[in-house]
A protein has these predicted regions:
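Bacterial Sec-dependent N-terminal signal peptides
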Residues: 1-27
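A short beta-strand-turn-helix
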Residues: 34-53, 82
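Short, internal strand/loop/helix patches
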Residues: 105-127
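Typically the conserved alpha-helix immediately C-terminal to a functionally engaged Cys/Sec
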Residues: 66-83
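A short, hydrophobic beta-strand/beta-hairpin element that forms part of a small beta-sheet core
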Residues: 122, 129-146
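Structural microenvironment flanking redox-active thiols in thiol-disulfide oxidoreductases
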Residues: 81-101
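Thiol-/selenol-based redox modules, centered on thioredoxin-like
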Residues: 142-180
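Short active-site neighborhood of thiol/selenol oxidoreductases, capturing the structured segment around
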Residues: 49-63, 88
């Protein structure tokens, strides 16, 4: 009995100690992850409480998309800024499910080896590269498209540029110059 109790206490102690080391090693994973919505959910929320919409266009096979999920989108600064200033949408650009957006139904198009979703093609102006990010204003009008993998230090300036409404009066390069 004593040996079993000692083993149990030892095992529980190891679990607590190892979980404590995770924080000591500087694990910067956010405790407030990004709240992802479907496009339909984001539009419905936007009607009740207007906010800009951030759309992450991804595919299941995209390695850089997965890397952004594991690094950039788990960064606390990025996650908090996105949650506070945008309704965030994760949109699989090859999903088979029809989507109604602004009164129009968008469908999957079986083309080539994988196909694509018409909404992704429409929002990305036919430039289907992944990851790509689409920013919409409160009227669901596209502000800009931002293609490619981005580290937290690369995406934060563009999030602040769009989220803060600076795109209405400044070009991005002017905004960056003022921020430095």
């Amino acid at each position: 009995m004593n040996k079993s109790l000692f083993s149990l206490i030892f095992l529980v102690s190891i679990v607590f100690i190892s979980s404590g080391f995770k924080h000591l090693n500087g694990d910067k994973k956010t405790e407030n992850p990004i709240k992802w919505y479907s496009i339909e959910e984001a539009v419905a929320l936007q009607k009740k409480k207007p906010k800009k919409i951030f759309i992450d266009m991804y595919t299941d096979w995209c390695g850089w998309c997965k890397r952004m999920d594991a690094t950039t989108f788990t960064d606390p600064t990025v996650a908090n800024y996105l949650n506070e200033n945008f309704y965030c949408v994760k949109f699989n650009a090859e999903q088979k499910t029809p989507v109604v957006f602004q009164g129009k139904t968008f469908n999957f198009v079986n083309s080539g080896s994988r196909g694509y979703h018409e909404l992704a093609a429409a929002l990305l102006d036919g430039q289907l590269g992944y990851p790509s990010f689409v920013y919409l204003n409160e009227k669901l009008e596209r502000i800009t498209i931002s293609p490619g993998y981005k580290q937290p230090s690369q995406i934060m300036p563009e999030l602040k540029y769009v989220g803060g409404g600076h795109y209405e009066t400044l070009k991005f390069n002017e905004f960056i110059s003022k921020e430095q």
